[in-house]
A protein has these predicted regions:
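Short catalytic micro-motifs in class I SAM-dependent methyltransferases
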Residues: 156-157
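Short acidic-glycine-tyrosine-enriched beta hairpin
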Residues: 16-36
Length: 251
């Protein structure tokens, strides 16, 4: 809350509209930060009051709120609690929800995808936000990553790729990860107890991703149920089993 002219009455309230405390603020006042979900009321004390409100959000939600992107993937948000800013490849970046989030935290981001309109959108947002993100067109099926990285992230991507290329793709990802670096993969599964309800070109089997990374340190691994942003005929987000893995290259 910033006051440019005159004064206002700020009232802090309970959820049932009971007054907790009141303050009169002017342009000279040291106005405290209004906490999220804090009930309050603002009352002008003059007819010519000039003021404005600025709304803040967490970094993980900033780009989704401002540019109507999906939020940064929850596993990427979780991973940065372990991984400090470093050289990262967002493999299959889409419109850049994860690349933008990582870049805003100080990561040196390269973002690649085959979707040219999505890449252009990412370039536009990065320019508007003054973020230095290297954006490139790349067919993941070629398994031809050239540079090495400290962190390679590929969330909700493998299931859209050519099944015959998966072995080479994962090998290439692993080879281009520096020792001590990390891979984050989240991808759809199809298992006996939970057949995949969508016709993805590729789905992981039980323990398949874990086996690919048997020589790595598994920081996190599960095969839990999750939801796609895509909805079914009733408007419910589609539920299926995902392999979720954060692994560290130790040799």
């Amino acid at each position: 809350l910033t006051i440019l002219r005159r004064e206002l009455l700020y009232t802090s309230l309970t959820e049932d509209d009971q007054i907790i405390e009141e303050f009169t603020f002017t342009p000279e006042s040291n106005i405290p930060f209004v906490e999220p979900r804090a009930w309050h009321r603002v009352t002008p004390l003059t007819d010519d009051l000039e003021c404005y409100l600025e709304f803040y959000c967490e970094p993980k939600n900033y780009f989704s709120n401002k540019y109507e992107l999906n939020p940064a993937h929850s596993e990427v948000v979780e991973a940065v609690k372990t991984i400090k800013p470093c050289k990262v490849l967002d493999l299959g970046c889409g419109q850049g929800r994860n690349a933008l989030f990582l870049s805003s935290l100080g990561f040196d981001v390269t973002a690649v995808d085959q979707n040219i309109p999505g890449l252009q959108y990412l370039k536009n947002v990065a320019k508007a936000e003054n973020l230095d993100i290297k954006v490139a067109h790349y067919d993941i099926n070629t398994a031809a990553i050239q540079n090495t990285y400290d962190f390679i992230s590929s969330t909700v991507v493998l299931m859209f790729l050519n099944p015959e290329c998966i072995d080479n793709i994962i090998t290439n990802i692993q080879e281009q990860t520096n020792i001590g670096g990390y891979n984050l993969i989240v991808s759809a599964m199809s298992t006996e107890d939970a057949p995949c309800p969508l016709p993805f070109p590729f789905t992981l089997k039980e323990n398949e991703l874990k086996e690919y990374y048997r020589d790595w340190e598994l920081v996190k691994y599960n095969e839990d149920f999750g939801h796609l942003h895509k909805t079914d005929a009733n408007g419910n987000r589609i539920k299926l089993r995902f392999a979720t893995m954060l692994a560290k290259k130790v040799q």
